[in-house]
Amino acid sequence: MIKLRDELGTATTDSAQKILLLGSGELGKEIAIEAQRLGVEVVAVDRYANAPAMQVAHRSYVGNMMDKDFLWSVVEREKPDAIIPEIEAINLDALFEFEKEGYFVVPNAKATWIAMHRERLRETLVKEAKVPTSRYMYATTLDELYEACEKIGYPCHTKAIMSSSGKGSYFVRGPEDIPKAWEEAKTKARGSAEKIIVEEHIDFDVEITELAVRHFDENGEIVTTFPKPVGHYQIDGDYHASWQPAEISEKAEREVYRIAKRITDVLGGLGLFGVEMFVKGDKVWANEVSPRPHDTGMVTLASHPPGFSEFGLHLRAVLGLPIPGEWVDGYRLFPMLIPAATHVIKAKVSGYSPRFRGLAKALSVPNATIRLFGKPEAYPGRRLGVVLAWDKDVQEAKKRAEMVAHMIELRTRSSDWHSQDYEKRKHLL
């Protein structure tokens, strides 16, 4: 790890700076594209061939990232300057071993270890960062789950202790939902479900993500820069639409920066963190943290200047390149270019070789564009693309993104065409 960098080499030569992506989805693809623009060599790893980031990397490897020996074989061969986890399903022991051997793990192995485990994260938020969260309890048996839900109160949320994207989570309205919540955690979690966290339901106005980025300043000191908070909503626990700026009060915005600063200072390291929070009026509660670019932050592909999306900011922090900002009331802020919004394009069916139509109409809409991720396989709920829209009025950007997304139809080799307008919950149009 260096401090502020003044030089870069050339990819595929002996002067190259090299990054290794552990996970090669749509977020990794955008990191790889930003790296390519700076002549940085990119190596992408995932469990399946032709994952999105692999399509724009210099080299790729397919294997089980829970297998420590596989990860070591790649690292020893490539000797990257930075190892960038993009997903949760990675052997954590390997990350600590890489650091011990002198490799730079982004942001650091400990932050990744904490963030992917809800109990470790919640205890870190409450006891070390000392930031407000919803009330919570843990359960390891069905009887304990009944007891915890009664004490927290209904409605409440149950979540597998290790998972992501809403998998293994359930909104519990009353005791009759608890058996289903237990089954959901035990069968749908993307990681361990040996324990379940029960969280108080916060009746929030908006859910936001703060994309706080820790990086070196011109004096070689680590500072934190804050883009405008990103508003978003989820459907069935998974991101469906986002927009920037979030429509919150000035007081709440300052509290968002304060909470994000306390959390990222505790986690440490370099890079961008997606800090999820609930906002109601002027009150803010911390929820979860992603130690990497965040799904909802794809809106910055439209709202931020070229090269400074959340992916560009993450890469600059990793490489030790400068990030502009302005100090306002004690916080270093990154300026937006224009209000913008996203809306997902999701599969409703399973199958291979997805095809999309409706593009002639969708791509004719002014102030909007589409990103198709290039995933070779579809299944219900899988995110295959996103619409970006921008406008001086963020409400208009939100409507435009939604409208364009619903123009797209999708099919696979084994299914018929289906439109995106099958989902209407929380929509504006």
UniProtKB/Swiss-Prot annotation:
Keyword Metal-binding: yes
Pfam families: ATP-grasp, PurT_C, RS_preATP-grasp-like
UniProt-annotated binding residues for ATP: 118, 159, 199-202, 207
Gene3D superfamilies assigned to the protein according to its UniProt record, in alphabetical order: 3.40.50.20, ATP-grasp fold, A domain, ATP-grasp fold, B domain
InterPro entries documented for this protein: ATP-grasp, ATP-grasp_carboxylate-amine, ATP_grasp_subdomain_1, PreATP-grasp_dom_sf, PurT, PurT/PurK_preATP-grasp, PurT_C, Rudment_hybrid_motif
GO cellular component: cytosol
Residues that, per the record, bind Mg(2+): 276, 288
EC number: 6.3.1.21
Family the UniProt entry places it in: Belongs to the PurK/PurT family.
Protein purpose: Involved in the de novo purine biosynthesis. Catalyzes the transfer of formate to 5-phospho-ribosyl-glycinamide (GAR), producing 5-phospho-ribosyl-N-formylglycinamide (FGAR). Formate is provided by PurU via hydrolysis of 10-formyl-tetrahydrofolate.
Name of protein: Formate-dependent phosphoribosylglycinamide formyltransferase
Source lineage: Archaea, Methanobacteriati, Methanobacteriota, Thermococci, Thermococcales
Gene: purT
